[in-house]
Amino acid sequence: MAIMQINFYSKMLKKNTTILAILPVDKPDKKFQKDVDSENLKTLYLLHGYAGNYMDWLCGARIVELSMRYNVAVFLPSGENSFYLDDEEKEEYFGEFVGNEIIEFTRSVFPIPQKREKTFIGGLSMGGYGALRNGLKYNKNFVGIIALSSALIIHKIAGIPKDYRNAYASYNYYRRVFGDLNSLIGSDKDINALVTKLKQEKGSIPKIYMACGRDDFLVQENRDLFNFLKNEGIDVVYEEDEGGHDWDFWNKYIANAFEWMSKVSD
């Protein structure tokens, strides 16, 4: 097992950024052989939630254990509070960063598979939304999406007034992150619209694993998305259980997600 912190210059963010790499190499009973074993790996780009950073998954979940057990290389980037969307004013393109640039960078540096059918994106809360949005927008890069307790908030913030404020942020934040809030529905930030567009274009739609706790304040939005995806004929698994918006729930269901991931093929 190798855990590495990598600092590199991102062209999409126009600054140095840090990612954490967890690689299941050199197991106690078997030495890693790049030419043979790299193609047996799967790769997961795993996104943190609001107010988090690249350390969240390492500190909060059993990611190292799961990486070893399921033979998955895991990469943990920092998305700040961007919802993993592009900010054209600041020229920080977090969507392009997690949807494309980080895949190209890690494939050029690490002994990981180069193929879509081995590549997944996932996340929790804000990161669950980011995984869904960018997994669909950059669908040619990902065979599967893991979305836990996803922050599917666009229908709540679409068209909000300028004096709007909730427990998390204000109109100014949502306007900065999501752009014109009156044009949000139907845009490429709308998960439903992305699915509809891919179906119309006959694009390859990644398989999706979703989970949310019954006591989570986002549970109805996650139910609604699951029902939409199911009605659209998308290959989606949804699990709901007792629990809230916390690491107790995410620890249980990221393990289920790894099990699901082990069975996914293109």
UniProtKB/Swiss-Prot annotation:
Gene3D superfamilies: alpha/beta hydrolase. GO terms for molecular function: acyltransferase activity, transferring groups other than amino-acyl groups; hydrolase activity. Its EC number is 3.1.-.-. GO terms for biological process: xylan catabolic process. Keywords: Carbohydrate metabolism, Hydrolase, Polysaccharide degradation, Xylan degradation. InterPro entries: AB_hydrolase_fold, Esterase-like, Mycobacterial_A85_antigen. It holds the Pfam family Esterase. PANTHER family: DIACYLGLYCEROL ACYLTRANSFERASE_MYCOLYLTRANSFERASE AG85A (PTHR48098:SF1), ENTEROCHELIN ESTERASE-RELATED (PTHR48098). This is Acetyl esterase.
